[in-house]
Amino acid sequence: MCKGLAALPATCLKSAKDMKHRLGVLLQKSDSCDYGSSQGKKEKVSSSQRVSQEEVKKWAESLENLIHHDRGLAAFRAFLKSEYSEENIEFWVSCEDYKKTKSPAKLSTKARKIYDEFISVQATKEVNLDSCTREKTSHNMLEPTLSCFDEAQRKIFTLMEKDSYRRFLKSPYLDLVSPPRAGCGPENCKRAHAHALDCNSNIISQCA
């Protein structure tokens, strides 16, 4: 017997609305089925940019392998950002960039910027360093060299290696190499619509 929406419990109405939203998303996806060859080219480009399983396996071997890979560094950076501790990897990256400085005239300016941002007492992104390392790094600011942050960088690397890196390995970072979803061909689109309609019918029948 057909019942009006007013007769349905609130939970059922919510479920029906949720399913309506999902169905709308599926319908939008079906519109993409008519894309031309240009869409196929985009999918090939996207596929080629995926990280290989071999590369990701190396990430689990060591933190060094992870952060010396562009995509690995980006993934680890995003993970640390989600934990509100991205200052550690940002400091490490800044030190790596600093060591590549070729102009002696720029050393002092770049060193001071890194120090003020990550090491000084009033640093906006202060990293966790022991007092001895912090004091030694502060002393190095008197005559900055390419190695003036080496000890501090090593300490932060070790901190990440023993702490956040281990948590990263337990995170769903392997999703980066999960198989791409099947293309939205005619059959796939039909199955998607059928699945949505079946789910919608189940919700209504349960609420009746």
UniProtKB/Swiss-Prot annotation:
<feature type="lipid moiety-binding region" description="S-palmitoyl cysteine">
    <location>
        <position position="95"/>
    </location>
</feature>
<keyword id="KW-0597">Phosphoprotein</keyword>
<dbReference type="GO" id="GO:0009968">
    <property type="term" value="P:negative regulation of signal transduction"/>
</dbReference>
<dbReference type="InterPro" id="IPR034953">
    <property type="entry name" value="RGS_RGS4"/>
</dbReference>
<dbReference type="Pfam" id="PF00615">
    <property type="entry name" value="RGS"/>
</dbReference>
<dbReference type="InterPro" id="IPR044926">
    <property type="entry name" value="RGS_subdomain_2"/>
</dbReference>
<feature type="lipid moiety-binding region" description="S-palmitoyl cysteine">
    <location>
        <position position="2"/>
    </location>
</feature>
<feature type="lipid moiety-binding region" description="S-palmitoyl cysteine">
    <location>
        <position position="12"/>
    </location>
</feature>
<dbReference type="InterPro" id="IPR016137">
    <property type="entry name" value="RGS"/>
</dbReference>
<protein>
    <recommendedName>
        <fullName>Regulator of G-protein signaling 4</fullName>
    </recommendedName>
</protein>
<keyword id="KW-0564">Palmitate</keyword>
<keyword id="KW-0734">Signal transduction inhibitor</keyword>
<keyword id="KW-0449">Lipoprotein</keyword>
<dbReference type="InterPro" id="IPR036305">
    <property type="entry name" value="RGS_sf"/>
</dbReference>
<comment type="function">
    <text>Inhibits signal transduction by increasing the GTPase activity of G protein alpha subunits thereby driving them into their inactive GDP-bound form. Activity on G(z)-alpha is inhibited by phosphorylation of the G-protein. Activity on G(z)-alpha and G(i)-alpha-1 is inhibited by palmitoylation of the G-protein.</text>
</comment>
<feature type="domain" description="RGS">
    <location>
        <begin position="62"/>
        <end position="178"/>
    </location>
</feature>
